[in-house]
Amino acid sequence: MTVANWQVRDLTLILRTGEMKSRLEQARTDFGALLSETVYFQPSAIRLGEFDDEYIHSRQELVYVYLREDIARQCALRRNLPSNSSNFGTMATAIPPWLMNARSLNRVMQERCDQGGLVNYYQGPHTNQFFLAIMPSNCFVRFGTDIINNENYGFXARRGNTLEEGEDDDDEMDDEGEAGGAEPRECQIGNLINYPIIALGSCDLSA
């Protein structure tokens, strides 16, 4: 089975937290069982018949990209991730949709993203009332953590949008140059990024 055959789980009619948790866990388990452990998913623009350098490990935990409803539904249908920062980056978080209300979540998203991108959290809580559940690829880097109810919840952004603490792209480029020139890394960047979407859901949940 390939990513193209994966049917995005539509969980928008699930209104109870307990059922949402179990459905998401089932989707995560099914995704890992049906695909290989390392999944390449984006056809290469420079190597015909091959994939670019972005991949995901299909046995990991889910993270969430929060959006407004119309963008969420279109992205799930077309297997896209939208940008939620001014440099076309995509930020995802381990904070699950049942942990806080839309207004509180919106404040957290504003603290982590600037006023740019297709999804702009500064426009209000309606911008984060739906979610796409995904698994982060190798092009995501973890850039921060929030502690909520004594639990750690991480934030990750696609590589190039932010740097891990202590990381220096200039040094990396110099090292590659001294090594005789490493192969260029190819991955898709833009307002909409082709990406495996595991599930779509609403944050309007009750206990």
From Swiss-Prot:
The keyword Acyltransferase does not apply. Residues 161-185 are annotated as: Disordered. It holds the Pfam family RolB_RolC. This is Protein 6b. Residues 164-178 have a biased composition (Acidic residues). Involved in tumor formation and increases auxin and cytokinin effects in host plants. It comes from Agrobacterium tumefaciens (strain 15955). Keywords: Crown gall tumor, Plasmid.
